[in-house]
Design a protein with these regions (language model features):
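Short juxta-domain linker segments that transition from a proline/glycine-rich
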Residues: 1-333
Length: 333
């Protein structure tokens, strides 16, 4: 689907899908792009399906990489025939599909495989190169690498996104790395080991440079690269890694930085040292930090599911009243 769309607008790669390509892609799917100053804060884009207009923030209100991904994700919903989600599982599934579509649109498979193949020949595969060549976010580049590298090059891989405290937002693997999980196997909100690259990157002398590290674990030794994304102000860690055996194909595999993790053994990093327990148990009373960012996109209405969780629909409808499009509002007062 993305290949046909890109060919239709004249993109033949390799390299960045241009702004003109994106505008033409929107038209190919039957939409016009409109950049506005007053998009509601709770929405990344608003689509008027009656007038076939997709509203996105002005360039000065969002980074160009962010704006490109928002356009591509929005087009993905329509290209894939998504309907209003009926429950939260449906909503999440549609988001995942639209995000994958966006990655495939902005970093086309054939072009990405060409870049990765050339880099593999030099032992220099890097997420950063995809980030720069295709002008996409580091996280999207990391997802695209992990989408394609096992299928095309038989290299096992894992991906993590975590916050400065090590709490996982997203993670998946096919290389056997031991991801933390609760009794039900849920990984979101679990804390990664203190000695993993995703945590150690924040402790390094230059925490905003790429952090390369080998970590010995109960499942084997893994090489990882961690990048700290500062967009949004919190500074989340995006980590990609593979087994020690396959690290030779990646830039940064020559690092001498090594650590050992004994997790899930609680004595590794989850339990405080016995001496500290003896000194302070019973007299320490911390107040937990609010981790509201984990639930900011979740539905807050306990009575009924909202098809667009986290979005203030009053603001959305007010916005559309201000931007009625050429056909005007569907039901004028």
């Amino acid at each position: 689907l993305t290949g046909a769309a890109l060919a239709a607008v004249g993109y033949h790669g390799p390299g960045t899908v241009s702004e003109r390509n994106l505008t033409d892609l929107a038209a190919w799917f039957g939409f016009t792009l409109a950049r506005v100053q007053d998009l509601p804060a709770s929405a990344r884009s608003i689509s008027d399906t009656r007038n076939r207009i997709i509203y996105v923030p002005q360039r000065n209100n969002a980074s160009n990489r962010t704006a490109r991904s928002v356009i591509a994700q929005t087009l993905g919903h329509f290209a894939l025939g998504h309907h209003d989600p009926v429950d939260f599982e449906d909503y999440v599934g549609q988001r995942v599909e639209a995000n994958y579509f966006a990655g495939a649109l902005l970093a086309p498979e054939k072009a990405v495989v060409s870049v990765l193949g050339d880099a593999k020949d030099r032992g220099d595969i890097s997420v950063e190169d995809l980030n720069e060549v295709f002008y996409i976010s580091y996280e999207m580049a990391a997802h695209r690498l992990t989408n394609l590298i096992t299928r095309h090059f038989d290299i096992p891989i894992h991906f993590q996104r975590s916050d400065p405290e090590g709490l996982l937002w997203k993670a998946y693997e096919n290389d056997g790395v031991l991801l933390p999980g609760d009794a039900d196997g849920t990984i979101e909100g679990q804390r990664v080991c203190r000695w993993w690259s995703a945590r150690q990157a924040f402790e390094s002398e230059d925490s905003y440079s790429l952090h390369y590290q080998y970590t010995s674990t109960a499942a084997g030794t893994y090489w990882c690269v961690t990048h700290i994304e500062v967009e949004g102000g919190r500074g989340d860690a995006v980590t990609v890694g593979t087994t020690e055996e396959h690290a030779r194909w990646f830039r940064g595999s020559g690092t001498t930085r090594r650590a050992t993790s004994r997790c899930p053994d609680p004595t590794c990093c989850r339990q405080p040292p016995p001496a500290a327990v003896r000194r302070w148990e019973g007299v320490a009373w911390p107040s937990a930090r609010d981790h509201s960012h984990f639930v900011s996109g979740l539905p807050t209405d306990t009575v009924a599911f909202s098809a667009f969780p986290g979005v203030d629909m009053t603001d959305v409808y007010s916005f559309l009243d201000r931007h009625p499009g050429p056909s005007g509002p569907p039901h004028p007062d």
